[in-house]
């Protein structure tokens, strides 16, 4: 009886060992993994080799973590030679899908607001797509983390994030003893002039730096709009120390819109910022859209304009 019991136990142990081996083999042979970005989970290749990128803002982040791509979007901006050499698939909002499919990507990276329209076509071709809701500077660190995990370069991503956060802290430390400047951020386009809320790129950096955006006093605190109507009458009442102007569109159309809404009115000349020559036009490359890895440089530019303090990295 004792011998039978020992044999039974031995048999059970063998079965468990075989089962354990089978489970280990199954796990190690998995070809996909699940990654999360801002609460959204994506199934992607375990070790992607052909990453197609439809947005150059995502592309720069991918290469920052030592990732590689097989495509980019067309642009007039100057790119690093390695990025310039990649096949261009057309403008960000108008991708050539035939060309993309011919590249045979194993995963596609794009933006929800630009590339959602291509999602069903990618699905029908069994190509996983990661469409990011990548918008404000708050998304930069999560994006780097995600791309580090996607490419299996987690350590590189952590290093890039550490430098990025250290540089931002350096900018903040440079003005920690300054009286917060009162700022208005105007968005000037060919259609008119509005004011930025904290949801917009430049105003969010103003907030991060501890400056006061005078526009927020007119909001209920729940708005998700990036810009809101803002009259010269309200601007005159707020009378900020500095007016930052972020432009979008053709220069002559913007000038015309600014004259109509603001500068042709005699009240404009009475503004403190105008009288002190503190109306500052900011380059759209850094201040209209998320500047990504250049966020510390953009914030340093705001500090230079607001306080006259140089911050170098």
Segment roles from a protein language model:
Residues 141, 149, 242-313:
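Structured C-terminal subdomain patch of bacterial secreted/periplasmic proteins
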């Amino acid at each position: 009886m004792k011998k039978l019991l020992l044999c039974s136990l031995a048999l059970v142990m063998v079965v468990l060992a075989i089962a354990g081996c089978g489970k280990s083999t199954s796990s190690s042979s998995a070809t996909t993994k699940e990654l999360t970005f801002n609460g959204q989970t994506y199934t992607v290749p375990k070790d992607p080799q052909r990453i197609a990128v439809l947005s150059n803002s995502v592309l720069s982040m991918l290469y920052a973590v030592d990732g590689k791509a097989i495509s980019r979007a067309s642009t007039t901006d100057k790119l690093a030679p390695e990025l310039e050499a990649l096949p261009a698939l057309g403008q960000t909002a108008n991708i050539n899908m035939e060309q993309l499919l011919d590249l045979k990507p194993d995963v596609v990276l794009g933006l929800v607001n630009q590339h959602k329209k291509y999602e069903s076509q990618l699905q029908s071709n069994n190509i996983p797509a990661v469409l990011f809701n990548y918008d404000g500077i708050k998304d930069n660190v999560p994006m780097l983390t995600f791309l580090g995990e996607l490419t299996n370069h987690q350590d590189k991503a952590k290093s890039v994030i550490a430098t990025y956060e250290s540089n931002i802290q350096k900018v903040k430390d440079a003005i920690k003893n300054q009286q917060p400047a009162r700022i208005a951020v105007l968005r000037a386009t060919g259609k008119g002039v509005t004011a930025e809320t904290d949801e917009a790129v430049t105003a969010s950096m103003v907030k991060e730096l501890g400056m006061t955006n005078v526009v927020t006093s007119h909001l209920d605190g729940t708005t998700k709009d990036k810009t809101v109507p803002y009259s010269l009458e309200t601007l005159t009442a707020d009378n900020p120390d500095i007016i930052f102007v972020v432009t979008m569109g053709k220069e002559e159309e913007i000038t015309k819109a600014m004259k109509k809404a603001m500068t042709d009115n005699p009240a404009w000349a009475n503004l403190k910022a105008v009288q002190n020559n503190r109306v500052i036009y900011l380059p759209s490359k850094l201040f209209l859209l998320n500047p990504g890895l250049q966020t510390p440089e953009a914030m340093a530019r705001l500090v230079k304009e607001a306080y006259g303090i140089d911050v170098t990295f």
